[in-house]
Amino acid sequence: MPWVSLYPVALFDRTKAPLTGTKRYVAHFSPETSRPPVRFFWSMTLYDNDGFLVDNEFDRYLVNDRSKPKYNADGSLDIYIQPDKPANPAQARNWLPSPPATSATRGFRLITRLYGLSDKGIKGVVDGTGWHGPSLLPCAPDGSTTEGVACAS
């Protein structure tokens, strides 16, 4: 059986608003979906609307299973997407720098790369009967989300 790759793209957050540098986000994987069904590896990367990597002063361009992200006690996984580095070291480990608010008009997209999906795995991702990507939750000014997931501090 062949193993293939799939690259789901997120252009909008959970509220269907376009991704922008004026907001902070949490990409929340539930305990059931925190580990994508891949044989090889997965990664998450931000690109601007022209298709280029989102430049940042930290030279940090992805979070993946090889970067050993910090999972929550319940098995879920939160990836923090924001321009500023989280003060909490565990959150900083799961941080993906987004464009600063000054470049908000350009927006960005989140690409999740899944390497080594089986035919069954691809079908489940594509038709919605299997693994699905994270909820991309916008952070409120007080650091909360509508689904009770905490944003980075």
Where are these regions (language model features)?
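A compositional/structural signature for long, glycine/proline-rich flexible linkers
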Residues: 1-153
